[in-house]
Amino acid sequence: MHEHKAELRLITVALNEASTDSPSFRASVNYFHTRMESLSSWMHSTVDYVENTYKPSFQDFQRIKETLFSQLLPSPILLSNGFVSNQPYTPLLVRDFTRDVSDLSNTVMKIILGDENSQYTAALSALSSDAINPYFNKRKTFEYYQRKYDSFLTDFLAATNDGNTLIPQNLQNETFKLVDIKHKYIEASLDLTEAISLMKVNLDKFLIETIDIVRKNNVITTKDTKDVIDITPELTETLKDWTDWIESNLQTLQALSSKLSEAKYAILKLSLARMKPSRLIQDYDLKSIQNLKFNLPKSISNGNNSEEKGLSGWLYMKTTVGHDPKRVVWVRRWCFLQNNVFGVFSLSPSKTYVEETDKFGILWITVEYLPKEPRNFCFKLRIQNPNCKTEEENTYIDIILQAESIDELKSWINTLTSHKRIALSIKEENDPRYQLARKKIEPQFFEFASSSSTSTDKLLTSFSSKTLTLVEELKKNYMSEDDIYSIIDNKAYHLRVISTPIATQLTHLALFSTFLSVSNYYPCATQANTWGTANWNDLSYLVNPLKGSSVHKPATVSNSSRFSVSYPDYYPYSLKVDDIQFRSIFFSVNHDFLQVPKELVLLRYSSVWCPNNKQKFASMAFVTLNHIYVYLNISGFSYLRRIDLLDIDSIEYDKSPKHVSSRMLHMQRGDGLRFNMSVFFTDRRAVASKLQFLIENKAMHIPKGEKEVLEIFQELDEEIENEKKIIKDNLSESEHYSKDYDYLLKSTYDHHFENTNETPMELMSRKLRLEREAWCYFQDNFKVGSKTLFHVLFGDKSQVFPSSLFLCKKGSNLNNNSYWERIRRAKEDASCQFELCRKLQFQLNRTSNFIKDLLWLKDDNDNFKLVLQQRVTKIKQGYYFEVEEGPIIVKFPLCHPLLLRVRFIIAECITSQGESLKKCDLAILYDFNYVESIDKLNTKVEKLWLFERIHLNWALRYCKLEHSEINRKTREYLKKFNDREKMSDVIKLCGFLGVLPKERIENDEKAGDFMQPVYINYDFLSLSKIFTKLTVFYLSSVIIKTMKVLLAMVMVIFKCFSKVNKTLYYCLLISAVTNLFFVGKSIHSYFSVKSAETLFQNYANGDQRGLQIMHRSLTVPDLNLLTRKMMDNDQENPVFKRFDEDKNAYQYKGTRQEIAIKRNQVLTELKILQNTEKELVQGSYRKFIITERDKCITTQNEIFDLWINDTKLQDYCMACFAEYNRLSAIPV
C-alpha cells in the first residue's frame, strides 16, 4: 500500500476577496479590527491592573498572612523550658505546624493568584510583541493606503466633464496614478489577511500558554511521599488536546507559509494584469463614445447565443439623502450580474457586515450610456417593476451608476447587453435560465436587507410575504430562543460554531440562515457573509465541476429551500445544530445540488487531516450514513471534500502508546491510497468504532437506518464513559496525573473484535508452540491482511465452510452455517474475555459421491446431517485470529475411537517495529488421538496396532485433500477482488462476522463443553466403499498420468515443428518424399539381383558340387546368336523336324521336356543378367554417349570445314547419334 502524493488544490477565499476589495473583505477586516481593539484594550487594562493593583495588594496580603500565621499559636520558644507537659515534642509540633500551614497557604495562593515570577505578564508581553503589534502595524499600513485609494478615487470620479478632464492625456495620467495606488492598496490588503490568520493562531497559542501557567500551579507534590496530585484533571486532559492541536496548527502554518507567499504573489500578479491600463491615447478619448448607443439588436442570431460569464465590482450610485431639501450624493455599491440576475451589495452602517437589496432578472433591465451626465463613465439602468404591466412613470426605477474607468464602463454595458440578448434568445419558457431572467428576488431575511437611508437604496429594497424574520423561523423548528440570541450577540461558543472563510458581525447568523435560503444560483448576503462574493462552485470538490460554462443549469428554479429538512423526533438537538452548520458550509457554495442530499449528520469531530505524505491541515469532519465530509479553513485557505465510505477499506487507530500518535486514525482506500486523521477533543477509539461500523453497515445487504445507528452510537458513548469512570476509580490520585488512563480504554469495537490482551509477539510464540504440538499442520501465505482473510474464511456469506470439509457432501441443501454467538465466561481469565461460537451443518458423505448410496445398504450415518461447531478463541484486531473446530470422534472397525481436533490460525506478517506488511499466514493444525472410549476422551491410547496406524495414514491423506480444498476456495474468493484488498468488497462477497446481539454468560465448565463432539461410525461396508474408491482412483490416476506424459511429448514435438520456418518445412518435406522414391527403386533393384544370384548359386552348388568349374563370359551378342541358332535348329531344320515326328523319338520326349524347362530357366536368368549389365553400364555409358554427342554437335556447327572433309568423323558421330537414340528408347 502506498500513500497519496498529489497535493490538494486549496481555495484561497480570503486572499481572493482581498484582491478584489469586495464588501465581504472590508466587512470582515473591519469586524476583526473591532475585536482586536477590544482585545488590545483588555490586554492593557489587565497588564495595568496586574502591575499597579494586584502586585502591591498581593505583597501586602502576603505580609499580613505571614503575621497571622506566626501569631496563630504561641511561639515554640515560649513553650520550651518546662512550660508544657510534653516538653520533647510539643514545641516541635507547633514549629512544624506553623511552617506547614505557611507552605500550604503559599501553595493555595499560588493556585488562585499565580506566582511572583510574573509569567502571566510575560505571556501577555509575548502576545503583544509577536502577534498584536505586527497586526496593528499591518493594519496601520492598510488604513493608510485604503484612505489614500478611496480619497483619490472619489476625487478622480467626482471631476465634472469640463475641457481639462476630457483631455485623453489627463485621463491617462490620472488612471495610471489610480492603478499605482490601487496596487499598493491590494498588496497591503493581502498582507493584512496574512497577519489576521497568524494573529488567530497566536491568540490560541497565548491562551494555551496562559492556562498552562495557571494549571501548573494546580499540580501539588506531597512533601513526604512525593505523590503528585492534580486538582483539575479534566482541565489537564483538555489542555493536552489544545496543546497538541495548536502544535499541529503551527506546523501546518509553517508548511503553508511558502504556499501563502506564493499565493499572495500569484494573486497580486493576476490583479495587476487584470487592472493594467491601456497605453494607447485613443482609448481615453471620451468623445469617441459620446454618440455610442448600446441598444439591444432587433434580430438575434443563434450564432451569437453563447454563454457569458458574470461580472461584479464596485460602482458609484447616484442617490439623494434628506427630505427638504434633498441632497445628491454618490455612494459606493458592489454590483453583480450572475446567472442572468443583477443585484447590489452594500456595507452595513457599522461597516462590519454585508447587506443586500432586491435582485432583478436581466429581462427587466435596460441599459443606456449617459454621455451628458456631469460626471464621467456614467450609465443608466432602467428596471421595470415586474408587478406592473403598463409603461407609466412609476412602473420602473432609474439607477445612474458610474464606473471607475472607461474599460469598466464598456465591460458593464456590453455584459448587460449580451446577457439580455442571450436571455431573449431562449425559446423555452420553462428553461431555468429564462425563469431566473424574469424573476424579481426580494431579500429573504429582514436581518440582511439593506438598512441604508438613501432614496435609491430604499427603492431597490422591498419586502414581500416571502421575506422572513430569521430569528422567528429558527425559533419555530430548529433552535432554542437562548441559543438564537446568543448567536445574535456572538456568544454562541457553547454551540461549537465552526469558523467560516469570511467572518463578519453576522456570520454566525448567516451560517444558520443559509439552511433556510431558497437558492444560491446567484449571490446573496448570507453567502457574502460566510463565503464572500466570489463564485466557488467549480472548486467545491463535492462533485465534478461544471465544464464549459459558469452558468448553472438546474432542472427547475424552486421557490422552496433546497436545504430544508424535517428533523425526526429521535434526532438529538446537539446534532441538529451541527447538521445546520454542515449543510450551510458544504452546500451553500455548491450549485450542483438542486436539492441537498437528505443525509443527517451522525458524528462530528475535529481532526488534523493528512490527505497525503506532504500536507496536513486542521479540519472539521462531518459524518453521515454514507459519506465523510471534510472541511478545512486555515491561514486564508479553504477546502471541501466528500469521501464515500465505500471507498474506504478499513479504519484503524494507531496502536502506539505515545499520546500524539494515539490520536491517529489510519484510513485506507480501495485503490491502495492511505490517509490519516488525528482526532482531537473526542475519544478517537469511539470515532474509529463508529466509522468502521458505518463502513460495514453500508456494505450490508440491508443496512441499518439513521435511528438504529444513533442508538448504537449512544450505547457506545455510554459504555466508554462508564469504562472511563471505572478506570479512574481504580487509579490512585498520583496515577491520574502520571498515567495516560485513556490509553487503557477499550471501545466497544475492540470488545466485539478483540478478546485478548496478549501482544503480537506473545501470540506469535503461541502459534509456534501449537504448531510443534500438532500432529500435522499446513501453512499458506496470502497477500492480504489478516482481517480480510478472516472475513473470507468465516464471514456469514462465505461458502468456504462447510463445503471445503472433506466429510461434507458437496451441493447438499443441508449445508449451511449459523451466526456467531458471543459467549462470556462467568469467570474471565486474563488472556481471553469472551469467545465467538457458531455451528456448521452439513450432510455426511464418506465417499464423495463416487459410489451412490442407493447401491449399498445404508447404516446410521448415511445421508445423516452433522452439526460441527467452530469457536473463535483468540482475536487480536489486525494481527492474530485463532479458530478451533471440532472435536470429531471417528470409529473404525477393530480400532479405538479416533479424536480429531482442527485449529485455524491467521497471523499477520509484521516487521520488527510492529508494522504490518499486508500479508498473512494461514496455518491449519490437525491433532489426532486414539482414546480408550467415547466416555474417556482424556485417556490417550499409546500403543497402536497395524489397522490403527493404517487409518492414521489415511487420515493424513484426507487432511491434505481438505487443506487443498480450503486453499483453493480461499484463493478463488481473493481473485474476485482483483488484487485489491477493499474491505467493503470483502464484506459484500463474504459477509460480516454476524454476531448475535445478545450475549450468553456461561460458567467455565459449560463454556468449555459448548462444542459437543461429533460422532461418526465407519463399518466394514463403508470401508469397502472407500477401498473401492481408492483402487479406482489409483488406476485412473496412473492412466491419466501416462496419457499426460504422451500428450506432453506430442505437444513438445508439435511445438518444435511449429517454430520451424514454413518454407524450410515444405522443402524438407519434398526432399524427404523424393529420397523415399529413389530409395524404393534402389531396394527393388538390389533384391532382384540378390534373388538371381542366389538362384544361380543354389543351382551351381546343387548340381556341380565337387567338380572343377570353368567360367566363361558370355556377351550379349553371343547370347543373341546362341538363342537364334537354337531356335533355327528346332524350328527350321527339316531333318530334325522329321526325326521329331518319328515314333522312336517319343522315348526322348521326357528328357527333352526337362531340358526345355532348364533352357527356359537359363534364358530367364540370362535375360535378368542382361538387364543387370545394362543397369550397371547404362549410367556411365549414357554420360559418355551424351558427351560425345555434344562434341559432335559442336564440331558440326562450329568447325564445319573439318566436318565436311573428315568422313570417319561423320561416321563416328552418326554412330553416336544412333546409339544415343537407342539408349533413349530403352525404358529406365
UniProtKB/Swiss-Prot annotation:
<dbReference type="GO" id="GO:0005886">
    <property type="term" value="C:plasma membrane"/>
</dbReference>
<feature type="topological domain" description="Cytoplasmic">
    <location>
        <begin position="1"/>
        <end position="1062"/>
    </location>
</feature>
<keyword id="KW-0472">Membrane</keyword>
<dbReference type="GO" id="GO:0005783">
    <property type="term" value="C:endoplasmic reticulum"/>
</dbReference>
<dbReference type="GO" id="GO:0005739">
    <property type="term" value="C:mitochondrion"/>
</dbReference>
<keyword id="KW-0256">Endoplasmic reticulum</keyword>
<dbReference type="GO" id="GO:0032366">
    <property type="term" value="P:intracellular sterol transport"/>
</dbReference>
<comment type="function">
    <text>Involved in mitochondrial fragmentation during programmed cell death in response to high levels of alpha-factor mating pheromone or the drug amiodarone. May be involved in sterol transfer between intracellular membranes.</text>
</comment>
<keyword id="KW-1133">Transmembrane helix</keyword>
<feature type="topological domain" description="Lumenal">
    <location>
        <begin position="1084"/>
        <end position="1228"/>
    </location>
</feature>
<feature type="transmembrane region" description="Helical">
    <location>
        <begin position="1063"/>
        <end position="1083"/>
    </location>
</feature>
<feature type="domain" description="VASt">
    <location>
        <begin position="773"/>
        <end position="978"/>
    </location>
</feature>
<dbReference type="InterPro" id="IPR042067">
    <property type="entry name" value="Sip3_PH"/>
</dbReference>
<dbReference type="GO" id="GO:0005829">
    <property type="term" value="C:cytosol"/>
</dbReference>
<dbReference type="Pfam" id="PF00169">
    <property type="entry name" value="PH"/>
</dbReference>
<dbReference type="InterPro" id="IPR011993">
    <property type="entry name" value="PH-like_dom_sf"/>
</dbReference>
<keyword id="KW-0325">Glycoprotein</keyword>
<dbReference type="InterPro" id="IPR039463">
    <property type="entry name" value="Sip3/Lam1_BAR"/>
</dbReference>
<feature type="domain" description="PH">
    <location>
        <begin position="308"/>
        <end position="421"/>
    </location>
</feature>
<protein>
    <recommendedName>
        <fullName>Membrane-anchored lipid-binding protein LAM1</fullName>
    </recommendedName>
</protein>
<keyword id="KW-0812">Transmembrane</keyword>
<keyword id="KW-0496">Mitochondrion</keyword>
<comment type="similarity">
    <text>Belongs to the SIP3 family.</text>
</comment>
<dbReference type="InterPro" id="IPR027267">
    <property type="entry name" value="AH/BAR_dom_sf"/>
</dbReference>
<dbReference type="GO" id="GO:0032541">
    <property type="term" value="C:cortical endoplasmic reticulum"/>
</dbReference>
<dbReference type="InterPro" id="IPR001849">
    <property type="entry name" value="PH_domain"/>
</dbReference>
<dbReference type="GO" id="GO:0005789">
    <property type="term" value="C:endoplasmic reticulum membrane"/>
</dbReference>
<dbReference type="GO" id="GO:0031966">
    <property type="term" value="C:mitochondrial membrane"/>
</dbReference>
<feature type="glycosylation site" description="N-linked (GlcNAc...) asparagine">
    <location>
        <position position="1205"/>
    </location>
</feature>
<dbReference type="InterPro" id="IPR031968">
    <property type="entry name" value="VASt"/>
</dbReference>
